[in-house]
Amino acid sequence: MPVREVSRLPELNEILEKSDSNRLIIVDFFANWCGPCRMISPAFERLSMEFGNATFLKVNTDLARDIVMRYSISAMPTFLFFKNKQQVDSVRGANESAIISTIRKHYSSTPANPNAASDEEKKFLERFVGYTELRKMHTDEVFKALARSVMPDGISDRLENGEDEKKVLQELLDWFKNDFFTWFDRPTCLKCTLKCTTEGLNGTPTKEEKEGGAGRVEVFICNGCNSEMRFPRYNDPSKLLQTRTGRCGEWANCFGLILSAAGLENRFVLDTTDHVWNEVYLKKEQRWIHVDPCENTMDRPLLYTRGWKKQLKYCIAYGHDHVTDVTWRYVFDSKKLVTQERVRQGVLENFLGKLNARQMAGATEERKRELAVRRVCELMGMMVQEAKNQRIGWEKLGEDMGGRTTGSKEWRRARGELGDNPEAQVLGKPIEFRIQNDANHVEFSYDVNRDSYSQTPEKGFVAQTFECNNIQRKVENDWKMVYLCREDGKKEGNISWHFNLAPLVATDSKKTIEKVEIRMAGIRKFENGNILIIACLGDTCMRIPASGNLTIEDPKPEVLKITVTLSGGERNQAFQHAQLFRTEKDDVAEATESMVVRVYMK
């Protein structure tokens, strides 16, 4: 875990008080003017990543005087070790081996309570709490009345009169998808009518946007007239009845309110790999079914794993009075679930149990018994369906399932949700540099943050590639990192760019190419991941080193080929263990140079 700086004694006391009795707390007392403190700091950061069940803290002795006085610190650096709220050891001086030895002396890799969440697990689990508030809005009587005012006439009456629930539900889906709600990709400028091609930047919600539940807003700048366009990410479903546009989050949120208004008991399902949908309880069939308003489909739970080729991790369903894990419904083989990846299964079950109890607090005893019986039946149904799927087989199950249909093709491709799409492999043309008069060099670049190139076609990492196979652009919103890696489940990914150097000297017989500089930023390998980057020019090939920098002197004016192969890695996250262009996710206007090819002429 990252090292945390503590500035006040009450803050430190709270950490010690709340920590698990088996958790080791290490506090580094430092000063900015202290040379040994600066020397040992990188090692302290490294140790914080190595020992997961320990908390690493730093205290600036020039600022946190109350902590310094409490522990009588007189020399820097000093390291104090705490366990079960008590100081158990200390190390004075920048002695890395002594620090490691002391950590190992007191360290325990497991919490005293095996189901107690670690700090990292707590951070991950926090995301599940907010959606309980969302479901309360779906049961608001005023909101439901507003929803009924825009719905097709007679829906609720038809359900009350016993009409087939699935038939009515399909009509609702068709209406919502085709007549009511729209997909938001990028806006069209109201002034010059040009389609915006740039990514939205993070903006600050206005007072009005906040009143509609917008915690964030995407700001787009028109390429033609520089007009600003805003896309508030509204969470208030009644506001969405007015705006009637959004991405999957807005679709599932608004449709959840529509379902409640129609009298259909429903759940909001969150998938932590960035998709949401709904579930509806069919009273006659006594079962929950999958419903996706974006795709206008229902009762096709394997759509994501089999159709989109999406690797689901956690699927959590939120009813208005309960919360439950429904991941099994949406995977082909539960034995291969990767739910141990971010949080231990026992910790997840313990957390969801407490969250579910909180949601059920106002329910009657009769309702609680009903939910308990439903849950048992639901688990049995999942097991029976999985056995049936295994008999049918993976290939046959995919015959009526395709990739994702909502969103631009570039957006779906970047998310790896095109399914069995033959366009996953792209064969392009060699890139030709823009030649500027009086310039002694030309250059070409790619920015992984913006996912754009320096010349047209600009948008999407695939746009300028000569070949691209099994590669995706991965955005880690929780860690705020972005990079290229291979698609989940693929053993190898390849991407290449070809550059035609001949036109640079074709019009002037006296001009020659002096050198080519190549820079590939953010080359990262983890857990036995492999990255091979080769630059070929004519009959000569060179390996680009781990630094990502290569200079080719006196190159021939032929086709320069840069080829990247990503492979290796360990366990379920192997596809992420070889990363290209890894950088911090940044929403500011300045570009980042993930790849630069610069050609100098003489």
Swiss-Prot record:
Coiled coil: none
Catalytic activities: Hydrolysis of an N(4)-(acetyl-beta-D-glucosaminyl)asparagine residue in which the glucosamine residue may be further glycosylated, to yield a (substituted) N-acetyl-beta-D-glucosaminylamine and a peptide containing an aspartate residue
Essential cofactor(s): Zn(2+)
Annotated Zn(2+) binding sites: C189, C192, C222, C225
Organism lineage: Eukaryota, Metazoa, Ecdysozoa, Nematoda, Chromadorea
Keyword Transferase: no
Major enzyme class: hydrolase
Gene behind this protein: png-1
Bridged cysteine pairs (disulfide): none
Family: Belongs to the transglutaminase-like superfamily. PNGase family.
GO biological process: glycoprotein catabolic process; positive regulation of BMP signaling pathway
Subcellular location: Cytoplasm; Endoplasmic reticulum
GO cellular component terms listed in the entry, alphabetical order: cytoplasm; cytosol; endoplasmic reticulum; nucleus
Keywords: Cytoplasm, Endoplasmic reticulum, Hydrolase, Metal-binding, Zinc
Protein transport listed as a keyword: no
Residue numbers annotated as active site: C248 (nucleophile), H275, D292
SMART domains: PAW, TGc
Domain PAW: 400-602
Function description: Specifically deglycosylates the denatured form of N-linked glycoproteins in the cytoplasm and assists their proteasome-mediated degradation. Cleaves the beta-aspartyl-glucosamine (GlcNAc) of the glycan and the amide side chain of Asn, converting Asn to Asp. Prefers proteins containing high-mannose over those bearing complex type oligosaccharides. Can recognize misfolded proteins in the endoplasmic reticulum that are exported to the cytosol to be destroyed and deglycosylate them, while it has no activity toward native proteins.
EC number: 3.5.1.52
MF (Gene Ontology): metal ion binding; peptide-N4-(N-acetyl-beta-glucosaminyl)asparagine amidase activity
Ranges of residues in domain Thioredoxin: 2-130
Cofactor binding: number and manner: Binds 1 zinc ion per subunit.
PROSITE patterns, A to Z: PAW, THIOREDOXIN_1, THIOREDOXIN_2
Protein name as annotated: Peptide-N(4)-(N-acetyl-beta-glucosaminyl)asparagine amidase
